[in-house]
Regions:
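Internal catalytic domains of large membrane-associated glycosyltransferases
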Residues: 5-169
Length: 169
């Protein structure tokens, strides 16, 4: 049965992509009124969930996004949360140093918080739940990234939530 489901999913997706005037609106009608140039006015948390990953690449991936958000003049509306479940003491020490230096470098432009849990309770979902309990009420929106994610500032700024406040509700 999974092969049949996969086939029809691909077939319907192909037909929508091929024949719909706007494929995104065809599958998400709420996107119809979104221009993509809406002014950013809401507080957004960007969550970077990590576990036992060397921080060099993550810092390299974050830097262009941070620079783009600061250059757009909206850095004060974003807060980066590095949510670590790292169990390896050596990697944890490196995370603390690298993300501490990153936070110091961007101190006056974009807030960066590094938090490490000693216990990996609930795995990644538990990591995000812990964020929601501690800081969730401080933000209107959240974008979740994995350790290997790369997202440009333009992609973050094109997010759809400001355009249609009920999308995702």
């Amino acid at each position: 049965p999974w092969i049949v489901v996969g086939f029809w999913n691909a077939a319907i997706g192909f037909l929508i992509m091929r024949f719909a005037a706007d494929p995104v609106v065809a599958v998400l009608p709420a996107a119809a009124g979104i221009r993509g140039d809406e002014v950013v006015t809401a507080s957004t948390a960007i969550l970077l969930c990590i576990r036992n990953e060397l921080p060099d690449r993550m810092v390299r991936n974050l830097e262009p996004m941070l620079a783009g958000l600061a250059a757009a003049g909206v850095g004060n509306l974003f807060h980066i949360y590095v949510l670590s479940d790292t169990g390896d003491a050596g990697i944890a020490a490196e995370e603390t140093a690298r993300f501490g230096a990153l936070a110091a470098r961007w101190r006056d432009r974009i807030e960066i918080t590094y938090r490490r849990r000693d216990l990996n309770t609930g795995y990644k979902a538990g990591n995000i739940r812990d964020f929601c309990q501690r800081w969730g009420d401080d933000h209107d929106f959240a974008v979740t990234l994995d350790a290997d994610s790369f997202m440009t500032a333009d992609a973050v700024l094109r997010r759809r939530s400001n355009g249609r406040l009920l999308v995702g509700a």
